[in-house]
């Protein structure tokens, strides 16, 4: 399998792909900020990690006086009883329509695919309270007053939004009807959501919510190497999730087996079902494939190993099958690659790895007292070579001994 990946990488380095740098429209969205503010006031951890202090100060000073408002009380109740948080908040924002008269309604032009944590009764109840909050707090006025900070974010993000190969999605997933745009939301910091909506005319609007900003001494920035793969990841959800849904019955058994093996680590990341794991697995595989096709220096095995550490143990097999069928849609190879995965062989490999040892020595005698100051040597010896990307803060040193 490794030879196959190396051969593919060599092919890519010999035929560098070029792509049109069409700028993806990027904006702040008043509906998203409105929902984020309410969930922040309701105490949602995922909406209380913004790093841009002027924005945070503006939010808190403006809206804390309304902490007892019904919209915030409902948000607290929905979080506790229905698990409405994270992407469910962004999903509601995407399905809202803000009229010229300043009224919020559920947009009837969008297919009713709002996150299923929102019941119809909850939607109706919440929108009524939301309208009152919007008017009472003069939310639109606050949103407009913060345009200078928004502009800083948009300017900082422009390098990323102009360097996305949109044609790749149509070519990879055999779909060309998508309308791409990006919503920046610093209030969602440390979380990003792959939101998409299908309109009555058939248009599929992909509008991922992206945070990932850095703030230092008044300067806002977005690191391209870190953020661009996240944007690709969130765009991929709009394509990958339906592929999994369509083929779920044919892969469910093996997916459930894989999920049981890694349930603990996956659940810690909020991937709490086998189907959610598979959404993420196919998306993460797609991002690696994008990296392969746009950067000849991509270390495929490093990316695969990192995904396996996070519990996504099917990535390598899907990517292998996909690379062996370069022209295929991932859905065409999905069932075969997953169903050929041996959970028994994987568990045996893990058990063997756990037997491997690490030894250490030091030139200080164990238990020695009154040790004089000076240079000491602490040697760690592994039973194999260390990887250059190993997660430590020391200088990477290949070999068995450090």
Task: Label every model-predicted segment.
Residues 225-246:
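Active-site recognition of the HExxH zinc-binding catalytic motif
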Residues 108-113, 193-225:
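Active-site scaffold of zinc-dependent metalloenzymes
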Residues 21-103, 310-319, 327, 331:
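N-terminal mature-domain "stem" immediately C-terminal to a signal peptide or N-terminal signal-anchor/transmembrane
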């Amino acid at each position: 399998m490794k030879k196959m990946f190396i051969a593919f990488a060599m092919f890519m380095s010999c035929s560098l792909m070029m792509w049109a740098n069409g700028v993806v429209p990027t904006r702040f969205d008043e509906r998203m900020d409105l929902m984020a503010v309410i969930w922040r006031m309701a105490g949602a951890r995922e909406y209380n990690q913004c790093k841009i202090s002027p924005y945070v100060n503006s939010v808190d000073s403006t809206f804390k006086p309304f902490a007892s408002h019904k919209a915030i009380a409902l948000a607290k109740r929905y979080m506790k009883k229905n698990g409405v948080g994270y992407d469910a908040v962004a999903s509601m924002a995407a399905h809202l329509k803000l009229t010229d008269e300043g009224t919020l309604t559920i947009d009837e032009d969008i297919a009713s695919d709002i996150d299923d944590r929102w019941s119809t009764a909850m939607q109706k109840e919440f929108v009524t309270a939301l309208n009152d909050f919007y008017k009472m707090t003069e939310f639109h006025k606050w949103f407009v007053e913060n345009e200078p900070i928004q502009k800083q974010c948009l300017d900082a993000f422009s390098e990323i939004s102009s360097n996305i190969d949109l044609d790749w999605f149509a070519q990879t997933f055999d779909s060309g009807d998508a309308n791409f745009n990006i919503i920046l939301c610093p209030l969602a910091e440390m979380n990003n959501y792959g939101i998409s909506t299908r309109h009555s005319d058939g248009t599929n609007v992909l509008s991922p919510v992206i945070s990932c900003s850095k703030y230092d001494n008044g300067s806002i920035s977005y690191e391209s190497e870190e953020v661009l793969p996240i944007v690709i990841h969130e765009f991929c959800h709009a394509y990958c999730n339906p592929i999994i849904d369509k083929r779920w019955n044919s892969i469910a058994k093996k997916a459930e087996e894989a999920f049981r093996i890694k349930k603990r680590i996956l659940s810690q990341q909020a991937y709490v079902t086998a189907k959610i794991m598979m959404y993420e697995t196919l998306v993460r595989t797609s991002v690696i494939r994008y990296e392969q096709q746009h950067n000849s220096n991509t270390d495929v095995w490093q990316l695969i190993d990192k995904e396996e550490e996070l519990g996504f143990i099917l990535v390598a097999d899907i990517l292998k099958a996909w690379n062996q069928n370069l022209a295929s849609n991932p859905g065409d190879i999905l069932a075969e690659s997953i169903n050929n995965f041996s959970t028994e062989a994987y568990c045996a490999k893990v058990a063997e790895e756990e037997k491997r040892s690490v030894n250490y020595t030091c030139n200080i005698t164990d238990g020695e007292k009154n040790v004089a100051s000076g240079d000491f040597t602490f040697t760690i010896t592994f039973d194999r070579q260390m990887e250059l990307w190993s997660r430590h803060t020391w200088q990477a040193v290949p070999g068995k001994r450090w």
